[in-house]
Amino acid sequence: MSAVRPVSGISLAARYAVPFVLLLIPLWMAKVNTVVPDPYLDEVFHVPQAQAYWDHRWFHWDPKITTPPGLYIWSYILCAAALVLRGSPKELNAGALRATNVAAAAVFLPWRLQTLLDALRKVRNTRPSGAWLSHTVLNICLFPPLFFFSGLYYTDIVSLLAVIEAYNWDIKRSAGSWSLLKTAVFVATGLTALVLRQTNIFWVAIFLGGLQVVRRLRQSSKASQASSLLQIIQSGFNNELYDPLVSEASFFDYVKTSISLVSVGLRNFIPIIISTVPYLVILAAFGGFVLWNDGVVLGHKEFHTAGLHLSQMLYIWPYFMFFSWPILIFPVINLVLPNSVIPAFFDYGFTKKQKGLPRIWTALVIIPIMLAVVHFNTIIHPFTLADNRHYIFYVFRILRSHPAIRYAAVPTAYFVGGWAVISAFGFSTTKPQPQFVPITKSNELAAAQKGQLKEAARKKEKSERKSKSKKASQVTASPPAQDQFSPEVLARIQEHLAQRQKQQQEVPRASFVLVWLAATALSLVTAPLVEPRYFIIPWVMWRLHLPPQPVPLVYRQQRPRDEREALHADLATNFSLFMETYWFLAINAATGYIFLYKGFEWPQEPGKVQRFMW
């Protein structure tokens, strides 16, 4: 039976509820404006700078601001449009500027995320499911660090929006007419993303450029059937690419894929360079800015010197696990537990290749590397330990409470968390393959009789009743002979159909994980500070490319017979999505309440309320 996602009233209700739930974003901003009307924390720098631009003082710049002026230009455009249409605002305060962030978070970002997610599904040749797409977009917009800063005047929302828009145009330019014009628009949106935040270079140039290289190589090469490392290198120079599905890839397969990409890339060097020209233009523009600015950050250079902070690539895994456990928990249970103990409601029917914990030798390679990073490269920025208003202050307080804790986190939070997060790209299933039955004499007779009926109907339209009756009786007398397939042939057909189905579904492959990891690492390891905001774009890209939650096996084998069964199937399939929604709402309610109503004072600043935040 088909493995299409079941549709019932509950999924459609979730889809239509999305705009109403997104109203929480302006409501959150309104509450912040009531309780915290004045600029808070980084807003103290951003709000006066935006006000200077509003007064057309374009050359005024606060030397403490580290990011480019894109946020202030965005606010200027929206506020100028509002002034023309409504006659206000004539002067900008924190509330008016926060509203420009809300416009991005509640209107433009959901729209462009929906467009991007739909495009990604179509590129993968899968049927878009409107309810699932809309619910996924909603959950991304409710992602707690993203939701929290949507009510404040920070750069994160508009920065993410620019990256998403660049991704949309990168997909558009690969298909259809006017590709040159679309490429120019993509380059413009990519440069716009850099005007909002410097680290966006790793997403609009490295990430999107890497995906373009992989697409080009896959289009111009054949799939490699090699297994050994030497064979993979040789097949690469024969234009055969080794790139297994994430669901079938081991740790060593990622090493093989890296080597295969290099060898196939060398064979297709000129076409790759041509296809990456737009990304190279963006990289060149960024390089020119760095040379002109004598560094990456604009202000406070003494506190934001670039370095190698490898521990960031350890912290990201518990970060993802904390926020995304609702969509990870049941697939992970399917991976580690035998099918016999999993309730049918949550049994996804994963294959043997998908199931199981990481292999021992994988742990023996990865865990010592992680321990070495913890020992030699744990960097704690002075700002982290000096500011108890951020939750990350208390995380590091726990890690520093005993020397053994930071090492104990390696096999549990870092290694297992990383395995679960990367495995999530392979949480996909395929529909059952048609079962072929060898044709026997009774089968031949049934097939012949079926053919007779079709033939008789066709003859009836073309000839007289008498001649038609004669021809039909002749066909009845001699049923057509049919060849019998051997079991070996049937097995090969089954295997071929299974491979074709996987190719059509096009779930993430090892090459995508490598590109995503590269962009994530480059954007994080160069940052000395550990801030939850820095992980937003890596999380969003991870969340966008996760395959849909698997349909339980019992509902793939048999279609729901009535509305009640359809409701049960829909609940089982979308249960994780709803859990994610409720989890995000709970976190947002808790952190919002703490921010607004659980303030405290510093002894050195009496009378001034300090507030907890991400």
Curated annotation (Swiss-Prot):
Residues 452-466 have a biased composition (Basic and acidic residues). Residues 450-483 are annotated as: Disordered. It catalyses: an alpha-D-Glc-(1->3)-alpha-D-Glc-(1->3)-alpha-D-Man-(1->2)-alpha-D-Man-(1->2)-alpha-D-Man-(1->3)-[alpha-D-Man-(1->2)-alpha-D-Man-(1->3)-[alpha-D-Man-(1->2)-alpha-D-Man-(1->6)]-alpha-D-Man-(1->6)]-beta-D-Man-(1->4)-beta-D-GlcNAc-(1->4)-alpha-D-GlcNAc-diphospho-di-trans,poly-cis-dolichol + a di-trans,poly-cis-dolichyl beta-D-glucosyl phosphate = a alpha-D-Glc-(1->2)-alpha-D-Glc-(1->3)-alpha-D-Glc-(1->3)-alpha-D-Man-(1->2)-alpha-D-Man-(1->2)-alpha-D-Man-(1->3)-[alpha-D-Man-(1->2)-alpha-D-Man-(1->3)-[alpha-D-Man-(1->2)-alpha-D-Man-(1->6)]-alpha-D-Man-(1->6)]-beta-D-Man-(1->4)-beta-D-GlcNAc-(1->4)-alpha-D-GlcNAc-diphospho-di-trans,poly-cis-dolichol + a di-trans,poly-cis-dolichyl phosphate + H(+). Coiled coil: none annotated. Its EC number is 2.4.1.256. Residues 474-483 have a biased composition (Polar residues). Pathway: Protein modification; protein glycosylation. One of its GO terms (cellular component) is endoplasmic reticulum membrane. The chain crosses the membrane at residues 10-30, 65-85, 94-116, 131-153, 176-196, 200-217, 272-292, 313-333, 360-380, 407-427, 510-530, 577-597. It is found in: Endoplasmic reticulum membrane. Glycans are attached at residue 574. Dol-P-Glc:Glc(2)Man(9)GlcNAc(2)-PP-Dol alpha-1,2-glucosyltransferase that operates in the biosynthetic pathway of dolichol-linked oligosaccharides, the glycan precursors employed in protein asparagine (N)-glycosylation. The assembly of dolichol-linked oligosaccharides begins on the cytosolic side of the endoplasmic reticulum membrane and finishes in its lumen. The sequential addition of sugars to dolichol pyrophosphate produces dolichol-linked oligosaccharides containing fourteen sugars, including two GlcNAcs, nine mannoses and three glucoses. Belongs to the ALG10 glucosyltransferase family. This is Dol-P-Glc:Glc(2)Man(9)GlcNAc(2)-PP-Dol alpha-1,2-glucosyltransferase. It comes from Aspergillus fumigatus (strain ATCC MYA-4609 / CBS 101355 / FGSC A1100 / Af293) (Neosartorya fumigata).
